[in-house]
Amino acid sequence: MEQILNIKDKVLSSVNMSPEIMIVSFRGEGNGQYIISSILDWLREEEITIDMVMQESYEDEKWSFSFSCGSEDKEKIEKGRMIVEAQKSETVKVYVQEGLSDVSAYGVGMATASRVVDRILKALKRESIKIYHVTTSEISTTVTVDIENAIRAVIAISTEFDV
């Protein structure tokens, strides 16, 4: 029973890293909803599993749509990028960042603790680890970092929270 209470009282209970991933970003002008819907249809047809999705729309009709996916889908993503470029679309640009990893921190204590994300970001800053993407929920925070820094990121976050 004492072990259960100790886990419950901790802010974080685990920190782990993903296999290699990449972030794919589409940036464009015009009817973003239509284009993003077409991108999602294409991803479904290609059976590409996506994660950490982010969409932004701006007042001047510009938009961006980003997601992460496994590096095993690199060839399919490159095919999609070539299709967009072959259309010579000046309204949509595709950017791909490779060689990344998601480092995720989990804990039920995160729901009631304050400054968790702040502490995670500061721990990574102390180690000079560049962060590409951050997502949070009540019980998890995920940061995307260069894969060569993923183990260092796990150690930095684990040390910060005594996991």
Residue positions per predicted region:
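A conserved regulatory-domain signal marking ACT and ACT-like small-molecule sensing domains
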Residues: M1-V163
